[in-house]
A protein has these predicted regions:
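Short, hinge-like loop/turn segments at secondary-structure boundaries
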Residues: 37-39, 132-134, 168-169, 237, ...
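Conserved SAM/AdoMet-binding glycine-rich loop
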Residues: 5, 108-231
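Hydrophobic, well-ordered secondary-structure elements that form the walls
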Residues: 180, 221, 241, 249, ...
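Proteins enriched for Cys/Gly/acidic motifs involved in redox and nucleic-acid/cofactor modification
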Residues: 2-124, 163, 178, 201-211, ...
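Conserved small/polar residues in nucleotide/adenosyl-binding loops
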Residues: 313-319
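Radical SAM enzyme [4Fe-4S]-AdoMet core and its adjacent flexible, acidic
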Residues: 125-142, 146, 192-196, 256-287
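Structural detector for short beta-strands of small beta-barrel domains
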Residues: 297-309
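Structural recognition of alpha->loop->beta junctions
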Residues: 14-23, 135-147, 172-175, 236-248
Length: 319
């Protein structure tokens, strides 16, 4: 992303850089390396609306038993704090058959867990097929021999359909795990963030998920100190987190991202206030997570063994 956004600046500030490749051109890496070895300084960027051929052979950067599987790239949500649409381009889904083919190849090489990723997985297929199609993709992926678990990251609340929830609840292969960044819980802040849901709509979706998948782990991300956030609005967020009881939460103080609308919003919040609010929110969440973790004591869970160091095994559970 750094290369895509600041390619010209990088060559000036870091003259020791040999080559620059943007987000839409990583399939050209062999060509770029050959040019770099010749002493040239190739810069291949500006094609962030292009979808590289994902069927190219790949080397896993993860342990051999797990693999990330990209199902789409780019984002059309245009949240006011976020630069991703500028860097990654418009939302573009891969074809179902291409994704399944890659999953089959990964399984043949010993992969047991697939982690589906995109900037917005829940919107998968809307551009290709005219409707949200993540449920249809999952129906195909569960048939891939050798795959034990399928985990999905980065849902947007408004695109989590009843059909998707039903599909996730139906198959044991699909982990009961929802990674759903909500970003805030106050409706006015959500509106100024250009988010597409209200607090009430998010609560309704979360309740539906827990109704269909009682053991589902829900993780979220939240921004504290968005421009103009008042103490009352933060308290609204605090009570929202207290009510919903996320299993896991990552919270961050707002930072001004260059060229985004929110960077120029008035009433930027002081850093000390942001940090104090973050501490309060994370203290609340730590207590919630501890209670929810204690509720698992005495239960037997199926895990994927990740390692052994003569003292203990390390592992990852489906939730």
């Amino acid at each position: 992303c750094l290369a895509e956004r600041y390619s010209s600046d990088i060559l000036i500030e870091l003259p020791e850089v040999d080559a620059i490749v943007g987000t839409g051109d990583y399939d050209k890496i062999a060509e770029v390396i050959r040019e770099a070895f010749k002493g040239e300084k190739p810069v291949i960027c500006g094609h962030n609306d292009r979808t590289p051929d994902e069927r190219l052979p790949r080397i896993l950067s993860t342990p051999s038993y797990t693999a990330y599987l990209k199902i789409a790239d780019g984002c059309d949500n245009n949240c006011t704090y976020c630069a991703i649409p500028m860097i990654r381009g418009h939302f573009r889904s891969r074809k179902i058959e291409d994704i399944v083919e890659e999953a089959e190849n990964l399984a043949k090489n010993g992969v047991k867990e697939l982690i589906l990723i995109a900037q917005d997985t829940s919107r998968y297929g809307k551009d290709l097929y005219g409707e949200y199609s993540l449920d249809k993709l999952l129906e195909k992926l569960v048939t891939v021999d050798g795959i034990k678990w399928i985990r999905v990251h980065y849902f947007y609340p408004e695109a989590i359909t009843d059909s998707l929830i039903d599909t996730m609840a139906k198959y044991d292969k699909i982990c009961n795990y929802i990674d759903m960044p909500v970003q805030h819980g106050n409706n006015e802040i959500l509106r100024r963030m250009a988010r597409r849901t209200t607090q009430e709509q998010m609560v309704e979706r979360i309740n539906k998920i827990r109704e269909k998948m009682p053991d589902c782990t829900i993780r979220t991300s939240i921004i504290v100190g968005f421009p103009g956030e008042t103490e009352e609005q933060f308290n609204d967020l605090y009570e929202f987190v207290k009510k919903v009881r996320f299993d896991r939460m990552g919270a961050f103080t707002y930072s001004q991202e260059e060229d985004t609308p929110a960077a120029d919003f008035p009433n930027q919040v002081d850093e000390e206030i942001k940090e104090e609010r973050l501490d309060r929110l994370m203290t609340l969440q730590q207590g919630i997570s501890l209670e929810l973790n204690k509720a698992k004591l005495g239960k037997t869970l199926e895990v994927l063994v990740e390692g052994y160091d003569c003292l203990l095994y390390t592992s990852d559970a489906a939730d």
